[in-house]
From Swiss-Prot:
Record's GO cellular component terms: cytoplasm; plasma membrane
Gene (name only): pyrD
Similarity field: Belongs to the dihydroorotate dehydrogenase family. Type 2 subfamily.
Role of this protein: Catalyzes the conversion of dihydroorotate to orotate with quinone as electron acceptor.
Protein name: Dihydroorotate dehydrogenase (quinone)
A GO term for molecular function: dihydroorotate dehydrogenase (quinone) activity
EC number: 1.3.5.2
Domain of life: Bacteria
Sites where the protein binds substrate: K66, N111, R112, M113, G114, F115, N175, N180, N240, T241
Protein's UniProt keywords contain Membrane: yes
Membrane topology field: Peripheral membrane protein
Length: 346
C-alpha cells in the first residue's frame, strides 16, 4: 500500500490515505486489534508537559490531519498525541495546485498548501464527537488566520477559531510561522506578536503554545522567548518548514513553499538547543527532520518535552511510530535511563 501511494500524485496520495484512515477511525472496534499490535505501552515513555499527560513523547505534527478526520487511527498507529490543523475560523481552499511535492532523493517534502481546511466549526464538531467516544489520545489544535484577513485583524481570526475549538483541545498552538500565507511570518515580529499574545492569552485557560520558524536569527528567537514568558505561554513548537534550499538534489528543489524532512534536521536541532538555553518554565516541542530513534533521543536529550513527526512518517509508513519508540527504549536501556524526565535532566 505504501509503495502504491508513492506512485500517485503526492496530494492525491495524502487524500486517499487520510480518507481510508478516517473510515477506519469511524469504526472504533476495528482499532483495538491493530492498536494492541502497534502501540508501545511502557511507563518509561510517559511524559507530563504543560499539565497534560502523554502516553509517549512522539506526536503527529499539524498538517497531516487538518480537519481532525482520523484521530482514532493516530492512536491505533502508536502516536502519543496528534495535532490537528492548521484551522482557520472560516473554511478556505488554500493555494492553487500542484502545491505538494516529494523530494525523494532528499527524503523531504515541499508544500505550499496555504492553510486549506474546512474551518474551525466543522473541526469542532469532529473533535466533540471524538471526545464523546472516549478517545484516549491527547489532541493539540493548531490555529491560523484566513488568507484574506489583514494582519491588523489577525488576532480576531485566532480568537474566533480558539473560541470555537477551546472545549475540545488539550492544548493550542498559534501558527505564525507558515511561509505559505502571505505576510503571516510578520506576526513573529515583536510589536505584532506582543499584541497577538496579549489578546489570546486571556482567552483560554488551556495550554497555549507558539510555533516558530527555523529561519529566525538567534536574536529573533530570544525576542520570541521573552514575549512567550511575558505572556505566560506554556511552550514553543520548533520548528515550522523552511524557505532554505541548500544542498538539495531533487528536481523539485526550486518549487516555492516550505521545506520539511531530512534537510531540516540540523537546523531544527540547532534552534531547539538555542531555545532550551533560555526556556525556563516553557515546554519545548521539537519537529523537523526526525527519522530515527537516535533523532528522537537527541531531541529529548537537547531539551524537548515532546517530539513531532510528519515527513518522516510519510516516508517511514505505518510502522514508523512503533520503530521509533522501541528504538528509544533500547537507547534508554543502553544508557541506564529509567524515564524521559531523567533523560532531560541529564
Amino acid at each position: 500500500m505504501h509503495r502504491f501511494l508513492f506512485a500517485l500524485d503526492p496530494e492525491a496520495a495524502h487524500g486517499l490515505a487520510l480518507g481510508l484512515l478516517a473510515l477506519w477511525s469511524e469504526r472504533g472496534p476495528l482499532l483495538e486489534v491493530p492498536a494492541r499490535l502497534l502501540r508501545v505501552e511502557d511507563p518509561r515513555l510517559r511524559v507530563e508537559a504543560f499539565g497534560v499527560s502523554f502516553p509517549n513523547p512522539l506526536g503527529l505534527a499539524a498538517g497531516m490531519d487538518k480537519d481532525a478526520r482520523a484521530l482514532g487511527a493516530w492512536w491505533a498507529l502508536g502516536f502519543g498525541f496528534a495535532e490537528v490543523g492548521t484551522l482557520t475560523p472560516r473554511p478556505q481552499v488554500g493555494n492553487p495546485k500542484p502545491r505538494l511535492f516529494r523530494l525523494v532523493e532528499d527524503r523531504a517534502l515541499i508544500n505550499r498548501m496555504g492553510f486549506n481546511n474546512r474551518g474551525a466549526e466543522e473541526a469542532a464538531r469532529r473533535l466533540k464527537r471524538s471526545r464523546q467516544r472516549g478517545l484516549p489520545l491527547p489532541i493539540g489544535v493548531n490555529l491560523g488566520k484566513n488568507r484574506d484577513t489583514p494582519l491588523g485583524r489577525a488576532a480576531e481570526d485566532y480568537l474566533k477559531a480558539l473560541r470555537l475549538l477551546e472545549p475540545f483541545g488539550d492544548y493550542f498552538v498559534l501558527n505564525v510561522s507558515s511561509p505559505n500565507t502571505p505576510g503571516l511570518r510578520a506576526l513573529q515580529e515583536g510589536p505584532f506578536l506582543d499584541e497577538l499574545l496579549a489578546r489570546l492569552r486571556p482567552a483560554t485557560k488551556k495550554p497555549l503554545l507558539l510555533k516558530v520558524a527555523p529561519d529566525l536569527s538567534p536574536k529573533a528567537l530570544d525576542e520570541v522567548l521573552a514575549l512567550a514568558k511575558k505572556h505566560r505561554l506554556q511552550g514553543l513548537v520548533a520548528v515550522n518548514t523552511t524557505l532554505a534550499r541548500e544542498g538539495l538534489k531533487s528536481p523539485w528543489a526550486k518549487e516555492a513553499g516550505g521545506l520539511s524532512g531530512r534537510p531540516l534536521k540540523g537546523r531544527a536541532l540547532e534552534v531547539l538547543r538555542h531555545l532550551a538555553e533560555g526556556a525556563e518554565g516553557l515546554a519545548l516541542v521539537s519537529v523537523g527532520g526526525v527519522e530515527t530513534p537516535l533523532d528522537l533521543w537527541e531531541r529529548l536529550k537537547a531539551g524537548a518535552s515532546l517530539v513531532q513527526v510528519y515527513t518522516g512518517f510519510v516516508y517511514g509508513g505505518p510502522l514508523f511510530p512503533r520503530r521509533l519508540l522501541l528504538g528509544l527504549l533500547r537507547l534508554m536501556e543502553a544508557e541506564g535511563v529509567s524515564s524521559l524526565g531523567e533523560l532531560r535532566r541529564a
